[in-house]
């Protein structure tokens, strides 16, 4: 069937901020789909609240809206743009939920918008647990016994009837949010209560447990003519009971018999037929009882998903692109296979290799959270590796995670960790075999299939053989074929990694590169997409004779290093291509645009380790390697690449080293007459206490060479310092701990700057909204700044110019400054792209990373900027010619942009929500407005924390904050809010003439502050941290992964209750001040104003 001619304009809803369960895979899917729809001749409108996405770049659509993803904002966009159709299957759960709401409220009918890609009825059948169960039973498919309940009493009765354990699944939530496994009544009460709050429709499904069964997924595609293909089968190494996003998964499935696979395939067709999926991709999950062979359907997603991104990368079959074309009427036999260029999309992919995905966790960022894995997803990212065998792929995937070795435990602890899965589970399986446990015993505790366990046990037996045959060439070859890295072999043999590399080179033991081609080499692939293997002879990655640049990606998403760096990488690739270079991308993350088959000229899906990168360099011989775009991961290996004579493009390694080494950096600042906060370094607890005593408390403690403020803290007492130093020493062994004097009440600024060696251009000058001391990645920020004088801005420009010239920056860098008493202090300089580059690019309308990349290959900065000149500058600054001075004019947009963060606290009940110098956010949103108040209010809505305009406020403010907080609370009272406060805060408010109701703290009488929150009487909580209230910290003592120190105070109880009840909360005076301005703006009139992104640049 040809494409539909009755629709011309299509609205696509993005997935919003990166959260656990909904990450970069939707930017990858969305970008792919937008390209496909545009190439088919449609006009496309995209709306997303996340600026750090390629899909919101103007070149991919006809109109881009960076606006909150709510029905109110979407209706305004529909009214303005008048699309003919809405495609909701590319933006994850967020887009599906919004499509349902727009349809049910009659908005789609009102403006004549059709749903394409999935019918409303189909979405409901797939998403509504009860309807899904009924539909499956009608189709003759077995599902688990289950019952939908909307109250605790029914849940308890159902669980008694089914027998414990039971699984609780809240309706319409993402990544299993609010769900879990209850082994007894007490756990059931807790999970159901939370689940009913988390579910937007306040229902949960109570389901019989199939803990320990095997879990499989099929990625399927169907077209309007009824053609149906299975793109990929995926097997979860972890059994049922662990969310598939937290499971290690393997493709294709390894332990299914052909008969079982055919049964599953037939069932998958019946599922999508019964649900009514006429076009597009779906993911269907099955559970299989290994003892009886009983197979049940667990669930299906009628959209592209995390698994479909994985299946696309694993097979080379672009599911999102195909799904988008099917949605507009094409059939599978009309869509080419883009990898081979010869076959059609109706051919099922076949693969002659094994793919392993492993999730990346960061539970140490959330002290107090339960580390056990269950049906609620907790991982923040994932890696994928490809090998000719399961062993090889597993070895490569494990080293892609960039994790340290697991703590050594005794057998008792190992058994406990096997029975109660935690993120380190795979390490404990290996540890069990090292300690002499057999396959049967490990299987009983973990329910991992015996085939996988035998493979893993064989690896441990190989380690024993390696110990016995030191420097044996044949055993070295075998270890490489089984996925062992040079570093692992070096550790077993007690030598350096370099020595193993030399031994390999002397004996000509090198990997070959094979192609991912969707057809097991039956047809020649047109798109060079490679993986390495030691199990092969022919090298398929034959290098061209073009001049090449190799870009190192950022590896798995994690806190502090997310999608923002992938955005920069992709822009870098495009720039180098425009300058005539062949681009080589190296990355291990299946969720990203950078690992799409058609982003770079050549893609290597490989771990980002020294060994793997050097092997690609040996094969490709690039002109140079770019380490400045992938966050900290490439920077960590830059030193070793330079030692091997690899050319680093852009800022030199010497400059990188100066910026990363505090002593060298402080010396440089002194030479050029710039200030930094007084500091010292310490290699022991005694030394640290001495340094802090000299500086005076409070001090900021941090390890060297980390990203995202790992193990960073503000410390007020010697006791706290001792505790933190022990933690920091674990994080960065061999590197001293850095201790800075903490600048209280300073304004923090973030500067993204570009230089070609001569000219210096501040692309973005951002003011942090949170107080100094909150990690810049966790603070909201505003561009342009709102509280800097003209004189101060000029001084900042001079300061940045001096520093950039001294560091010899070529390309992009990020500098953090603090301003206290009109003095400028340099906090740190990062000689690489920062996480704010996409935000700045969207705020000013100039692609910062593209310009930086071109500079790295010799282009001139004023010449590159002239394309965008004249751009708005500060009021009163008139610029006729760009290169009048070596300091190029700083952009000063007329519209205000606020970047707000999203932190997954609700996934980790028990964690304190206080912000500090350790970063914990997973994603971000952007709010754009005519003034700061409008931009801030929109950013709060986009982040899922809309500020109230009426109701009651609970205030409990620390003594140190009362002077500034009381007038702000008085403003809220004047606006009609009812104020409740604890005794001390109430007294301060009453002395300012504010009417207030006093509420007892916990233990001072009932109803107390917690009762008030639980009763739903409060619409906003204002609570700042008192200095005698220590934060909970994760401390690693080497024995256990981590434990929590600190005490759970009343403040902690209030904050966690507000989080649980979904009541907006403010924990600093700065955020209160911004909120007061935003609420005042909202009271004056609607802020539901929508503007095309490109229009905001012209104002």
UniProtKB/Swiss-Prot annotation:
Keywords: Amino-acid biosynthesis, Arginine biosynthesis, ATP-binding, Ligase, Magnesium, Manganese, Metal-binding, Nucleotide-binding, Pyrimidine biosynthesis, Repeat. Residues 542-944 are annotated as: Carbamoyl phosphate synthetic domain. ATP 1 binds at residues 129, 169, 175-176, 208, 210, 215, 241-243, 285, 299. Pathway: Amino-acid biosynthesis; L-arginine biosynthesis; carbamoyl phosphate from bicarbonate: step 1/1; Pyrimidine metabolism; UMP biosynthesis via de novo pathway; (S)-dihydroorotate from bicarbonate: step 1/3. Mg(2+) 4 binds at residues 828, 830. Mn(2+) 2 binds at residues 299, 301. Binds 4 Mg(2+) or Mn(2+) ions per subunit. Mn(2+) 4 binds at residues 828, 830. The keyword ATP-binding applies. One of its GO terms (molecular function) is ATP binding. Residues 1-402 are annotated as: Carboxyphosphate synthetic domain. GO terms for biological process: 'de novo' UMP biosynthetic process; glutamine metabolic process; L-arginine biosynthetic process. Mg(2+) 1 binds at residues 285, 299. Mn(2+) 1 binds at residues 285, 299. It is an enzyme of class 6 (ligase). Residues 945-1099 form the MGS-like domain. The large subunit is composed of 2 ATP-grasp domains that are involved in binding the 2 ATP molecules needed for carbamoyl phosphate synthesis. The N-terminal ATP-grasp domain (referred to as the carboxyphosphate synthetic component) catalyzes the ATP-dependent phosphorylation of hydrogencarbonate to carboxyphosphate and the subsequent nucleophilic attack by ammonia to form a carbamate intermediate. Belongs to the CarB family. This is Carbamoyl phosphate synthase large chain.
């Amino acid at each position: 069937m040809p494409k539909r001619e009755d629709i011309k304009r299509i609205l696509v809803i993005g997935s919003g901020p990166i959260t656990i369960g909904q990450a970069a895979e939707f930017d990858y899917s969305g970008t792919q789909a937008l390209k496909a729809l545009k190439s088919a001749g449609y006009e496309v409108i995209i709306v997303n609240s996340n600026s750090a996405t390629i899909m919101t770049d103007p070149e991919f659509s006809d109109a881009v809206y960076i606006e909150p993803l709510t029905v109110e904002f979407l209706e305004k966009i529909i009214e303005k743009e008048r699309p003919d159709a809405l495609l909701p299957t590319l933006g994850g759960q967020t887009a599906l939920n919004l499509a349902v709401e727009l349809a049910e409220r009659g908005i789609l009918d009102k403006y004549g918008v059709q749903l394409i890609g999935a019918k409303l009825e189909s979405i409901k059948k797939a998403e509504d647990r009860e309807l899904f169960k009924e539909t499956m039973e009608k189709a003759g498919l077995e599902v688990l016994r289950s019952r939908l309940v909307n109250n605790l009493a029914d849940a308890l009765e159902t669980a008694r009837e089914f027998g414990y354990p039971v699984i609780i699944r809240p309706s319409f939530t993402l990544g299993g949010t609010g769900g879990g496994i209850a082994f007894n009544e007490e756990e059931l009460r807790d999970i159901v209560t939370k689940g009913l709050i988390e579910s937007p429709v306040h229902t949960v499904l109570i389901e019989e447990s199939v803990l320990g069964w095997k879990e499989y997924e099929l990625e399927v595609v169907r077209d309007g003519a009824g053609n149906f293909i299975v793109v990929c089968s995926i097997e979860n190494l972890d059994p049922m009971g662990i969310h598939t996003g937290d499971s290690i998964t393997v493709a294709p499935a390894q332990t299914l018999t052909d008969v079982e696979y055919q049964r599953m395939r037939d069932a998958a067709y019946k599922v999508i037929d019964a649900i009514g999926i006429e076009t597009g991709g779906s993911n269907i999950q099955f559970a299989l009882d290994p003892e009886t062979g009983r197979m049940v359907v667990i669930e299906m997603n009628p959209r592209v998903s995390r698994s479909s991104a994985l299946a696309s990368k694993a097979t080379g079959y672009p599911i999102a692109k195909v799904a988008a074309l099917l949605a507009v009427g094409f059939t599978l036999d009309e869509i080419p296979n883009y990898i081979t260029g010869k076959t059609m999309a109706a051919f099922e992919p076949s693969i002659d290799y094994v793919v392993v995905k492993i999730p990346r966790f960061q539970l140490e960022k959330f002290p107090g959270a339960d580390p056990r894995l269950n049906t609620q997803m907790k991982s923040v990212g994932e890696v994928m590796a490809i090998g000719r065998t399961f062993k090889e792929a597993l070895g490569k995937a494990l080293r892609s995670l960039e994790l340290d070795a697991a703590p050594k435990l005794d057998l008792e602890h190992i058994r406990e960790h096997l029975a109660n899965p935690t993120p380190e589970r795979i390490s404990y399986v290996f540890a069990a075999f090292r300690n002499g446990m057999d396959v049967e015993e490990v299987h009983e505790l973990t329910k991992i299939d015996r085939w996988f366990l035998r493979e893993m046990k064989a690896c441990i037996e190989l380690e024993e053989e390696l110990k016995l045959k030191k420097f044996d060439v044949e055993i070295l070859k075998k270890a490489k074929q089984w996925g062992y890295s040079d570093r692992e072999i070096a550790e077993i043999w007690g030598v350096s990694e370099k020595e193993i590399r030399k031994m390999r080179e002397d004996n000509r033991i090198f990997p070959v590169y094979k192609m991912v081609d969707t057809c097991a080499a039956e047809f020649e692939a047109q798109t060079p997409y490679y993986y390495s293997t030691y199990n092969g002879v022919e090298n398929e990655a034959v290098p061209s004779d073009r001049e090449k640049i190799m870009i190192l990606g950022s590896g798995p998403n994690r806190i502090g290093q997310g999608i923002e760096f992938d955005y920069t990488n992709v822009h870098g690739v495009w720039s180098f291509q425009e300058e005539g270079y062949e681009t080589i991308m190296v990355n291990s993350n299946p969720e990203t645009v950078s690992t799409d088959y058609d982003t770079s000229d050549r893609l290597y899906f490989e771990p980002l380790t020294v060994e793997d990168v050097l092997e690609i360099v040996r094969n490709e011989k690039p002109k140079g390697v770019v380490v400045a775009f992938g966050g900290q991961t490439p920077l960590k290996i830059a030193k070793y690449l330079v030692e091997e004579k690899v050319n680093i493009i852009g800022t030199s390694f010497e400059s990188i080293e100066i910026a990363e080494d505090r002593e060298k950096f402080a010396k440089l600042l002194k030479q050029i007459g710039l200030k930094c906060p007084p500091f010292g370094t310490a290699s022991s607890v005694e030394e640290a206490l001495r340094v802090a005593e000299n500086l005076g408390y409070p001090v900021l403690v941090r390890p060297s060479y980390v990203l995202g403020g790992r193990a960073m803290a503000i410390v007020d007492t010697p006791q706290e310092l001792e505790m933190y130093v022990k933690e920091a020493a674990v994080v960065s062994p061999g590197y001293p701990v850095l201790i800075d004097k903490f600048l209280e009440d300073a304004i923090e600024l973030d500067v993204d700057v570009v230089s070609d060696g001569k000219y210096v251009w501040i692309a973005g000058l951002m003011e942090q909204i949170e107080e100094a001391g909150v990690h810049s990645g966790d603070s909201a920020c505003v561009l342009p700044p709102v509280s800097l004088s003209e004189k101060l801005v000029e001084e900042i420009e001079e300061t940045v110019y001096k520093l950039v010239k001294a560091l010899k920056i070529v390309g992009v860098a990020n500098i953090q400054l603090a301003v206290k008493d009109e003095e400028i202090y340099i906090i740190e300089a990062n000689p690489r792209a920062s996480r704010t580059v996409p935000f700045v690019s969207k705020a000013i309308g100039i692609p910062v990373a593209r310009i930086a990349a071109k500079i790295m290959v010799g282009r001139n900065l004023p010449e590159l900027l002239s394309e965008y000149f004249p751009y708005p500058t500060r009021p009163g600054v008139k610029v006729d010619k760009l290169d009048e001075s070596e300091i190029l004019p700083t952009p000063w947009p007329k519209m205000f942009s606020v970047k707000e963060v999203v932190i997954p606290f609700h996934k980790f009940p028990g964690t304190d929500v206080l912000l500090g110098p350790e970063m914990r956010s997973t994603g971000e949103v952007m709010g754009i407005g005519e003034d700061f108040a409008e931009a801030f209010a929109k950013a709060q809505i986009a982040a899922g924390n809309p500020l109230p305009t009426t109701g009651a406020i609970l205030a409990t403010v620390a003594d140190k904050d009362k002077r500034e907080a009381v007038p702000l609370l008085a403003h809220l009272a004047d606006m009609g809010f009812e104020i409740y406060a604890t005794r001390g805060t109430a007294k301060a408010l009453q002395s300012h003439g504010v009417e207030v109701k006093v509420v007892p703290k916990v233990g001072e009488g009932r109803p107390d502050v917690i009762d008030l929150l639980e009763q739903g009487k409060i619409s906003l909580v204002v609570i700042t941290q008192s200095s005698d209230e220590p934060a909970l910290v994760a401390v690693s003592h080497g024995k256990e992964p981590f434990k929590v120190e600190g005490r759970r105070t009343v403040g902690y109880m209030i904050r966690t209750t507000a989080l649980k009840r979904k009541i907006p909360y403010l924990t600093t005076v700065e955020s209160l001040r911004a909120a007061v301005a935003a609420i005042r703006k909202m009271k004056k009139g609607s802020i539901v104003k929508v503007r095309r992104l490109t229009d905001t640049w012209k104002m």
